[in-house]
């Protein structure tokens, strides 16, 4: 994997002990490697201010367990004997980081049996990062006075076994002069006994903290409550959405009703024209006792409809604003009249050429009294509508009542 690397670290005295044990035997030897594996992320900043993070996994080999004969925990096919493996690794199963083998007078290449055995050990020990240390001593001189020891650390990657760099530490290396920040894998017996004595108060049987277990229970309870609240919130949001849709529909209906009412009001205003206040006040002033002239609606039979009468006082008292009193001048072009009335007026002019019409105001002053005039007007108004039209068109009434543009 890019950005990751593996490094093996083997102390000098462990390598010396392995070599001493192998040289004191007459055959090949094998065993297990104990230690720990740790990862470290190294961040290096370049001149371009770009971070380069690299993860380095270090396999620290600290101990070894030898097997005093070959095929002690496996057979010739590379199959692992579980019972024999438990017997060899009784209490140190979790600290196993790999296994090793000494082969005399051979090449630095893993055999097919060793590859099968390594994969089976990965399965039984549940350790995919398991490594294999191969040591191959050989004699370089004929007198057997000089020996050569080659060693290599192998690790499977993507189905193939690759060599892993192995560093043998000693007192002459500058890297080992500093303080170690990681604790050693070997712990004190007294400390372990004290921890086992009081561990029941803080740890469960599986090694987990009791407080952590309680916190996990509280977290699960909070999650359940949160789920129930989320369901209620979702339901309320759906109800609010439905109510908003209903409100929008009601607003649309209200807007339509207001538009219809506004259109109907405009039609009513057009159908009912504005009342002529001056005419109404004039009729109430000059004909106060004639309810027929005060009514806005009259039937075909000249019957007064009482609800249609105008009983409102418009407070218009100026006489000049009620009617325009000017001297009547007859003009056929301005006011055409029927042929029968025109003939009557011509006969009247021939009969009495010396008579002259007087203004209405002078005739009103020459009358004996206002009460007599009102009674005579009331008698004339009580006749039928057809008689009123004929009398208004007669020469006698024209002589008595000169015409006014207002009426």
Swiss-Prot record:
Location of region: Disordered: 344-407
Domain of life: Eukaryota
Comp. bias (Acidic residues): 388-399
Residue ranges of coiled coil: 209-259
Compartments in which it is found: Nucleus
Post-translational modification: Phosphorylation of Ser-404 of the pSXXF motif by ATM or ATR constitutes a specific recognition motif for the BRCT domain of BRCA1.
PROSITE patterns: MPN (PS50249)
Biased composition (Basic and acidic residues): 347-366
InterPro entries: BRISC_Abraxas1 (IPR023239), FAM175 (IPR023238), MPN (IPR037518)
A molecular-function term among this protein's GO annotations: polyubiquitin modification-dependent protein binding
GO cellular component: BRCA1-A complex; nuclear body; nucleus
Protein's GO biological process: chromatin organization; double-strand break repair; mitotic G2 DNA damage checkpoint signaling; mitotic G2/M transition checkpoint; positive regulation of DNA repair; regulation of DNA repair; response to ionizing radiation
Family membership: Belongs to the FAM175 family. Abraxas subfamily.
Subunit composition and interactions: Component of the ARISC complex, at least composed of UIMC1/RAP80, ABRAXAS1, BRCC3/BRCC36, BABAM2 and BABAM1/NBA1. Component of the BRCA1-A complex, at least composed of the BRCA1, BARD1, UIMC1/RAP80, ABRAXAS1, BRCC3/BRCC36, BABAM2 and BABAM1/NBA1. In the complex, interacts directly with UIMC1/RAP80, BRCC3/BRCC36 and BABAM2. Homodimer. Interacts directly (when phosphorylated at Ser-404) with BRCA1. The phosphorylated homodimer can interact directly with two BRCA1 chains, giving rise to a heterotetramer. Binds polyubiquitin.
Physiological role: Involved in DNA damage response and double-strand break (DSB) repair. Component of the BRCA1-A complex, acting as a central scaffold protein that assembles the various components of the complex and mediates the recruitment of BRCA1. The BRCA1-A complex specifically recognizes 'Lys-63'-linked ubiquitinated histones H2A and H2AX at DNA lesion sites, leading to target the BRCA1-BARD1 heterodimer to sites of DNA damage at DSBs. This complex also possesses deubiquitinase activity that specifically removes 'Lys-63'-linked ubiquitin on histones H2A and H2AX.
Name of the protein in its database record: BRCA1-A complex subunit Abraxas 1
Organism per entry: Mus musculus
């Amino acid at each position: 994997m890019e950005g990751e690397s593996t490094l093996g670290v083997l102390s000098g005295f462990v390598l010396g002990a392995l070599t001493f044990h192998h040289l004191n035997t007459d055959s090949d030897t094998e065993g297990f490697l104990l230690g720990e594996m740790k990862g470290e992320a190294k961040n290096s900043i370049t001149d371009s201010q770009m971070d380069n993070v690299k993860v380095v996994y270090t396999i620290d080999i600290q101990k070894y367990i030898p097997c005093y004969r070959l095929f002690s925990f496996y057979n010739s096919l590379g199959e692992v004997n579980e019972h024999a493996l438990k017997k060899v690794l009784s209490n140190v199963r979790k600290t196993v980081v790999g296994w090793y083998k000494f082969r005399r007078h051979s090449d630095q290449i893993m055999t097919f049996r060793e590859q099968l055995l390594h994969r089976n050990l990965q399965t039984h020990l549940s350790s995919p990062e398991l490594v294999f240390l191969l040591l191959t001593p050989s004699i370089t001189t004929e007198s057997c006075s000089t020996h050569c020891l080659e060693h290599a650390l192998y690790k499977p990657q993507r189905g193939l076994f690759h060599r892993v760099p192995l560093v043998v530490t000693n007192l002459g290396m500058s890297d080992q002069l500093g303080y170690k920040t990681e604790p050693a894998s070997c712990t004190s017996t007294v400390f372990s006994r004290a921890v086992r004595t009081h561990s029941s108060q803080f740890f469960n049987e599986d090694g987990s903290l009791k407080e952590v277990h309680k916190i996990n229970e509280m977290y699960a309870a909070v999650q359940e409550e949160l789920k129930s609240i989320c369901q209620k919130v979702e339901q309320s949001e759906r109800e609010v959405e439905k109510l908003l849709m209903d409100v929008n529909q009601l607003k649309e209906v209200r807007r339509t009703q207001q538009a219809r009412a506004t259109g109907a009001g405009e039609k009513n205003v057009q159908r009912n024209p504005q009342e002529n206040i001056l005419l109404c006040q004039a009729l109430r002033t000059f004909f106060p006792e004639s309810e027929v002239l005060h009514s806005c609606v009259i039937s075909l039979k000249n019957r007064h409809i009482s609800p249609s009468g105008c009983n409102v006082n418009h407070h218009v008292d100026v006489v000049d604003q009620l009617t325009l009193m000017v001297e009547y001048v007859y003009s056929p072009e301005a006011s055409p009249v029927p042929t029968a009335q025109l003939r009557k007026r011509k006969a009247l002019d021939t009969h009495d050429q010396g008579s002259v019409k007087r203004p209405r105001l002078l005739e009103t002053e020459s009358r004996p009294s206002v009460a007599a005039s009102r009674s005579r007007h009331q008698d004339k108004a009580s006749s039928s509508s057809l008689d009123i039209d004929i009398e208004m068109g007669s020469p006698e009434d024209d002589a008595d009542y000169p015409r006014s543009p207002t009426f």
